């Protein structure tokens, strides 16, 4: 099977060469193997650079032995040709599909690409994943493990997002500047003080909306009342008086499905998914707003760097930052945020989504993760780093389904 490649979105050879040289240079460095893998993990996923180019990296252990011909591995990009209504429960959207080959280097695939659109609060970005044809001539998918935005769930392609713009426009920059300064020069990075009392919240049941935006609304209304000297209702009083809020896990969760299949039920092709020719570059996709919520511990690991879209009213990462900024700017004193992160196990559904090298074997919750493998450990640490970069002041890691 020959895969024709559309060149509307292009690989930038010079910039890609620099990325490859950097990655290969790590092997000759004096860093430990774990330090090397941590550096590589920071380049995985898709990063929209200030110069308008997009850096892309995938870890693909064992992929080459599953592919009939090396050049049948390609990046597939879907760019919306009309606005997406983030509130709509169901809609049909036309996407322009582009395909291009990236560069393979050992267990990694790298590229610097021009022409991809970055998403932001107002607009949808390009969606992307890797595709390949296996030795049985079946079309297979490799998804981004560390996306910034995953609006249509774990089985759908990730969305390229302008994370630098998101961070630059947040409304708690004064708080971040203050807490970035430490009176103790030996403490790097600076640390905020330990909270004395913590309110644990399950996002899906803590507001009528069942979303992060619903929590933001509640705390903004409470803030307004405090600033105006108005009394709080008995219900509102339950949300205040705490130094920190700990949110039960917000990572993308498993999806309840009719069949044990790797196909997305929220990002469903109505035309052209299996077309491998160049003459049909417009595909129509039925989008369904994700609605899978639970206690948060049934995780597939994929996408743990971002938020379960079922908890996002807007399906935009900005919604989380808006909530954090509301807490940091609370009128009485800043309220810290604590993330509950689950890296001790993965649900069995993860076997459809991530490389088998991630798993060590079954346990009572699904699959044990292979923490002893340096690249797995490095990716989990990178997921944590990206999550904390939204400025959850602390994190709590669950070693099992609930520690």
Residue ranges and their predicted role:
Residues 1-67, 94, 104, 108-110, ...:
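The feature marks proteins involved in alpha-glucan
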Residues 58, 64-89, 132:
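Extended low-complexity, serine/threonine- and proline-enriched intrinsically disordered segments
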Residues 60-62, 79, 117, 134, ...:
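Short, flexible loop/turn elements at secondary-structure junctions
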Residues 80-89, 161-180, 379-382, 403:
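Extended charged low-complexity segments that act as oligomerization/scaffolding linkers
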Residues 85-104:
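Solvent-exposed serine/threonine-rich low-complexity stretches and specific carbohydrate-binding patches
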Residues 91-94, 193, 292, 300:
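Acidic/polar, low-complexity linker and loop regions
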Residues 211-237, 376-385:
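Short, acidic/polar
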Residues 234-243, 248-403:
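Substrate-binding/active-site clefts of carbohydrate-active enzymes
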């Amino acid at each position: 099977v020959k895969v024709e490649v559309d060149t509307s979105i292009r690989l930038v050879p010079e910039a890609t060469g620099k990325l490859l040289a950097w990655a290969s240079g790590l092997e000759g460095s004096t860093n430990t193997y774990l330090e090397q893998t941590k550096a590589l993990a920071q380049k995985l996923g898709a990063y929209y650079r200030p110069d308008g180019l997009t850096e892309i990296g995938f870890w693909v252990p064992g992929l080459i032995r599953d592919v009939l011909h090396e050049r049948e591995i390609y990046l597939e990009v879907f760019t919306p040709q009309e606005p997406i209504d983030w509130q709509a429960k169901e809609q049909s959207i036309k996407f322009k599909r582009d395909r291009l080959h990236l560069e393979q280097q050992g267990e990694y695939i790298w590229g610097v690409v021009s022409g991809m659109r970055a998403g932001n609060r107002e607009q949808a970005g390009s969606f992307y994943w890797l595709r390949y044809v296996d030795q049985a001539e079946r079309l297979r998918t490799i998804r981004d493990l560390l996306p910034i935005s995953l609006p249509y769930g774990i089985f759908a392609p990730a969305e390229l997002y302008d994370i630098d713009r998101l961070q630059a426009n947040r409304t708690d920059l004064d708080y971040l500047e203050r807490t970035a300064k430490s009176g103790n020069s030996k403490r790097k990075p600076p640390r905020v003080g330990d909270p004395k009392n913590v309110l644990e919240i399950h996002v899906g049941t803590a507001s009528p909306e069942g979303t992060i935006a619903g929590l933001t609304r509640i705390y903004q209304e409470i803030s307004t009342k405090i600033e105006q000297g108005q009394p709080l209702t008995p219900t509102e009083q339950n949300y205040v008086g705490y130094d920190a809020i700990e949110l039960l896990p917000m990572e993308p969760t498993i999806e309840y499905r009719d069949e044990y299949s790797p196909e997305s039920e929220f990002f469903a092709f109505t035309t052209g998914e299996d077309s491998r020719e160049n003459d049909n570059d417009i595909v129509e996709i039925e989008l369904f707003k994700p609605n899978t919520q639970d206690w948060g511990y049934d995780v597939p690991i994929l996408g743990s760097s971002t938020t379960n879209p079922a908890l996002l009213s807007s399906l935009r990462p900005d919604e989380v930052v808006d909530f954090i900024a509301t807490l940091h700017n609370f009128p009485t004193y800043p309220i810290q945020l604590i993330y509950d992160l689950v890296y001790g196990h993965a649900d069995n559904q993860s076997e459809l989504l991530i490389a088998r090298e991630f798993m060590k074997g079954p346990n009572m919750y699904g699959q044990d993760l292979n923490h002893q493998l340096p690249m797995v450990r490095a990716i989990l640490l990178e997921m944590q780093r990206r999550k904390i970069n939204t400025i959850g002041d602390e994190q709590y890691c669950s070693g099992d389904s609930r520690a």
